[in-house]
Amino acid sequence: LSIKINGYYPYSLIKIAESNGSFYPTEGAHRTSICRLLNLKIPTNTTNKRHLHWGVDSFKKPLISDKELNFILYNYFFLKDTARVFVVFPPAVGYADQIKEKINSQYKIKHELNLHLDEDWQLKNLLREMYSNDRVDVYKRDNCSILKKYNIIKEGKSHDFLILFAEANTTNKKQDIKKEIREELSQFVNVKDFITVHASDSIEEKNSLLNVFLNQNTLFHIKTMNKESELVDSLLKDYLFTLNKYNIKDSIVVGSTPLDLFGLRKTTDIDFCLSEQERKEKGFDQNPKKLGVSTDIVSQKPNYLRGEISDYALMTNPNYYFVYRGLKFATLEVMKKVKSILNRKKDIKDCLLIDDFIKKRKMP
């Protein structure tokens, strides 16, 4: 497995040398780590290098940071249509071994993630994102099924989740393993509460869960903000109406709205941008344009970040956005870059607000 500037190349071999009867890689530490992590075959080639010094210093610290690891995992599972994400709820985490054995009968678990939440409002935020699917009115109804889950789980002893990322063993149609797990654990967790295990049932839902659990920016927002923005929620209704009206497939909210979601200052409207290709397909030029009552498409000359980051990367690289209500929003770091380029009086004030926030919080 090799990631190069010019793209993925599956036959880039890692050179292996022999020393005292043992074989060692002479290069490709990151590739080797990734292959080991995902249980992939490591393509190798022998070399005649001998009498090399094999140091251990590189193993004294992680070869890959958490941010890099999540980025690698996100892209791996995003590209795998047969991948599935399983979320084990706190009441069932104690039966994780039984659940994993059941999942491994049809899938191969490639990665596990333990997620701990300290506060009830963090639990509410997480459930909101898990089930949002572009629904702004989550928790707005008294009989909301998600709110019922929240009320039950918050009374438990812990808010610990186990997330399992798996890949199907075969392409054959699978049984409803989620239902089977719930039934097998019914004596411990009430099936009707639906708080045993959740699993992605489509590629779209799988990708949505990846944007929650393998996006450090989304998890940061979930763990940071204890109040929901009623103003942003009301504006997002017009934004969603606009996206549907123009059949826009992918977009990202920029402007002041990300600042509002972190409680820095109130927003007044929704500004968003598209990829260059979709912008052309929809017949929009590079100039800003009002598309809804409170929704505007921004100027992209040549792109939103003036050449530093492509608009396509801005919307597809999870390092540049977080998810709220199932929708993508530019990170504060991205907005600081944009506003420092614009350098208007209001942008300078926003940069100071962002700087002050970052100093007080440990950003991902």
Residue spans for each PLM region:
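Basic- and aromatic-enriched surface patches that contact anionic nucleotides/nucleic acids
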Residues: 20-81
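Catalytic core of pol beta-like nucleotidyltransferases
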Residues: 233, 237, 285-362
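Helical scaffold of the NTase/Pol beta-like nucleotidyltransferase catalytic core
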Residues: 218-252, 356-364
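Catalytic core of tubulin tyrosine ligase-like
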Residues: 80-234, 317, 322
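Short active-site oxyanion
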Residues: 19-24, 194, 248-250, 269-271
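Active-site nucleotide-donor binding segment shared across nucleotidyl transfer reactions
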Residues: 239-270, 274-278
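Short alpha-helix boundary/capping and kink motifs at helix termini
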Residues: 1-26
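Short active-site loop/helix that positions an aromatic residue
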Residues: 29-42, 204-214, 261-262, 282
